[in-house]
Amino acid sequence: MASSGYNPYVEIIEQPRQRGMRFRYKCEGRSAGSIPGERSTDNNRTYPSVQIMNYYGKGKIRITLVTKNDPYKPHPHDLVGKDCRDGYYEAEFGPERRPLFFQNLGIRCVKKKEVKGAIILRISAGINPFNVGEQQLLDIEDCDLNVVRCVFMFFLPDEDGNFTTALPPIVSNPIYDNRAPNTAELRICRVNKNCGSVRGGDEIFLLCDKVQKDDIEVRFVLNDWEARGVFSQADVHRQVAIVFKTPPYCKAILEPVTVKMQLRRPSDQEVSESMDFRYLPDEKDAYGNKSKKQKTTLIFQKLLQDCGHFTEKPRTAPLGSTGEGRFIKKESNLFSHGTVLPEMPRSSGVPGQAEPYYSSCGSISSGLPHHPPAIPSVAHQPTSWPPVTHPTSHPVSTNTLSTFSAGTLSSNSQGILPFLEGPGVSDLSASNSCLYNPDDLARMETPSMSPTDLYSISDVNMLSTRPLSVMAPSTDGMGDTDNPRLVSINLENPSCNARLGPRDLRQLHQMSPASLSAGTSSSSVFVSQSDAFDRSNFSCVDNGLMNEPGLSDDANNPTFVQSSHYSVNTLQSEQLSDPFTYGFFKI
């Protein structure tokens, strides 16, 4: 029964989905499917629905297909499904069906050669909702077979109960065949990357559903900004792939910016669902130099860590170097065979002997091989020295490698005696029997002493119970060298130790090398150093070291290296460099 006061009309509750449905041919032999509603999802299927407003009662509904554009003409495609015949849907409904849902409607397409026959069939059946002229209906050139619209027409019963009163028809949104590229739903299936530089130019491969190469574009959108990807028709591969380059962003950025990327068809302004695309800020180090440096630094640090696991092997000290890295000045030896005299016998009756408190010692060896040079006589024995008697119980040495005799020493051996004259030498401590006191030399009765007597001194009667351990040169080499060397004063006897006091250390450190040496042309070989050796204690080497047999004259002999150590650490940067008697070492 019609409602009084208001005219009834038809309203579409849910429009059919425009895209995503495929039109089927009759030859496919299968159902054309159902037209989904526009709000349909995979989890919640919905269908087109309509409702008659201002009317409650029975009625009849007819649904036909018309063309996309106005004037809406009958379309050659057919509606198929339940309650469908001759290409259209028609059914009666009662007051209980509110609203009306159409879930079994499908679209079956016809071939192009069958289009005209289908239009004639519609005219004969009276299917012309908008009363378009017959001549215009037969003009099928402008008919788009890929797009249709649904027309909903309602008929109300008259007084006789026949459904003859028609309500104004209503047209739905267009429905596109998903199989046709010019009307199909646009969809981005996959891209090889979804980010790129803010400067643009990144090449992107995009896979999609069928598109027309002359009717498609890739669009980048963010608020009011819009840009398009750069590609040509040749970059569209078989309607399903597009290779394009990204456009540059509108401004420089410091942080990544996300925009929307979508496909758009210019002919109908259809767009696909959007996909996020991130613009990345421009790299400050475009060529990766910073990362290369970091990688190199990490490799170097790892190399250092790996090398740190290996302990450093102790290196053999080179010839002439000490344990602290100090070097001894190596000069030519006075002797041809490197002969070392043994230590003189020690006197055991010295009372009041102080306890040594300097345990570290040094030694100077005379084992350096060299050629025997000629030695001019540059020093003479003072005539004021008393004569020295020869003891018979304490010889100096009988173990010489060269022809060494008491009577063959040259007169240059007298140059050793001035070394015993210095006031500093007179204060040497008597901590061992091998020390000497030059003060006792003044009490000697003999005014002069021969070289043989000098090297035979070993008794308390001659040097006040303090014999000096010296090394004598060979007889055959005394007249051939211009650079003679005194042998050594040894500080390496653990039983005969001496310690320098703080005052002595300062004096030794302040001592000038020029005050400790004299040229070969000077009147004396040794210069008196009273300030330098004042109250300095020295000790002689023991017999075990001095009498070591088989001392090689080779400079690389380990025996020489072992006997070349000293530890008087305060003699830094001091070189006792007498060119005739000895070449003291450099620290």
From Swiss-Prot:
Sites of Phosphoserine modification: S267
InterPro entries noted in UniProt: Ig-like_fold (IPR013783), Ig_E-set (IPR014756), IPT_dom (IPR002909), IPT_NFkappaB (IPR033926), NFkB/Dor (IPR000451), p53-like_TF_DNA-bd_sf (IPR008967), RHD-n_c-Rel (IPR042845), RHD_CS (IPR030492)
Any single GO BP term: positive regulation of interleukin-12 production
GO CC terms: cytoplasm; nucleus
Keyword field: Acetylation, DNA-binding, Nucleus, Phosphoprotein, Proto-oncogene, Transcription, Transcription regulation
Official protein name in the record: Proto-oncogene c-Rel
Subunit structure, as described in the record: Component of the NF-kappa-B p65-c-Rel complex. Component of the NF-kappa-B p50-c-Rel complex. Component of the NF-kappa-B p52-c-Rel complex. Homodimer; component of the NF-kappa-B c-Rel-c-Rel complex. Interacts with NKIRAS1. Interacts with NFKBIB. Interacts with NFKBIE.
MF annotations from Gene Ontology: DNA binding; DNA-binding transcription factor activity
Main location: nucleus
Location of the region described as Transcriptional transactivator in the Swiss-Prot/TrEMBL record: 403-468
Compartments, as annotated in UniProt: Nucleus
Annotated SMART domains: IPT
Signal peptide per UniProt: none
Function as written in the Swiss-Prot or TrEMBL entry: Proto-oncogene that may play a role in differentiation and lymphopoiesis. NF-kappa-B is a pleiotropic transcription factor which is present in almost all cell types and is involved in many biological processes such as inflammation, immunity, differentiation, cell growth, tumorigenesis and apoptosis. NF-kappa-B is a homo- or heterodimeric complex formed by the Rel-like domain-containing proteins RELA/p65, RELB, NFKB1/p105, NFKB1/p50, REL and NFKB2/p52.
Residue positions, PTM N-acetylalanine: A2
PANTHER family documented for this protein: NUCLEAR FACTOR NF-KAPPA-B PROTEIN, PROTO-ONCOGENE C-REL
PROSITE patterns attached to this UniProt entry: REL_1, REL_2
All residue ranges annotated as the RHD domain in the record: 8-297
Lineage of origin: Eukaryota, Metazoa, Chordata, Craniata, Vertebrata
Pfam family, one: RHD_dimer
Ranges spanned by the short sequence motif Nuclear localization signal, renumbered to the chain: 291-296
